[in-house]
Amino acid sequence: QSLREVPGFLAFTAILVMLFVRQQNLAILSLVTLGVGTAITAFYPTALWLYFTTVIMSFGFHYLETLHNSLSLQWLSKEEAPKVLGQLLSTRAFCNLAVLGSIYIYLMFFAMNYFMIYVLAGGITIAIGIFCLKAIPHFEEKVIQKKALFLRKRYWLYYLLTFLAGARRQIFVVFAGFLLVEKFGFAVENVVLLTLVNAA
């Protein structure tokens, strides 16, 4: 659990990578990295392999989380950004519910098969990344973004809400689930159900 959060603290290094890689390409690369890390977790022979795949997966996830809002804002004009960002959030929430619901229904009728779930989830993620690379053209940035780290005092509320959202995710998605399984022996389907309710 601790290793998984190291890339989260290093997510700001995405700014340095963007000096050499276009932001759109970096986002797609992050998505593919997330998929690869997830897929190869299924083949873990040792605990060290699990640590390695967790870090790979986490780098992909945290870089993607860092980039997706920024990329959306560059793609959209200032007039259409609020509406489209809201639609993207709605779509993301729906997909989250659909995936968790599908996993829960699967667990109700079939025995848990970690190998299949990890390979399938990772494979789908990689396929989406390749599709994005091939199908979505490189777009010109409508808003030129500064490639430097800066803080603005007037954005303090946004920073606070982002921090609290991250803390909430850590508590409910990461550590609470781990604690319920490790200390209280919760079944996998019950953890999925709790995550589904939390996502709703």
Language-model segments: residues:
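Short amphipathic helix-loop junctions that connect adjacent transmembrane helices
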Residues: 1, 174-191
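C-terminal ends and interior cores of transmembrane alpha-helices
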Residues: 12, 32-46, 105
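Transmembrane alpha-helix termini and helix-breaking/packing motifs in multi-pass membrane transporters
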Residues: 12-20, 97-118, 177-178, 182-183
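Hydrophobic core of transmembrane alpha-helices in multi-pass small-molecule transporters
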Residues: 37-38, 48-64
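Intracellular juxtamembrane helix-capping segments at the cytosolic ends
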Residues: 63-76
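Glycine-rich segments within core transmembrane alpha-helices of 12-TM secondary carriers
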Residues: 83-103
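C-terminal membrane-cytosol helix-exit motif in multi-pass small-molecule transporters
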Residues: 103-107, 122-141
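Juxtamembrane intracellular "pre-TM" segments in multi-pass secondary transporters
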Residues: 134-167, 183
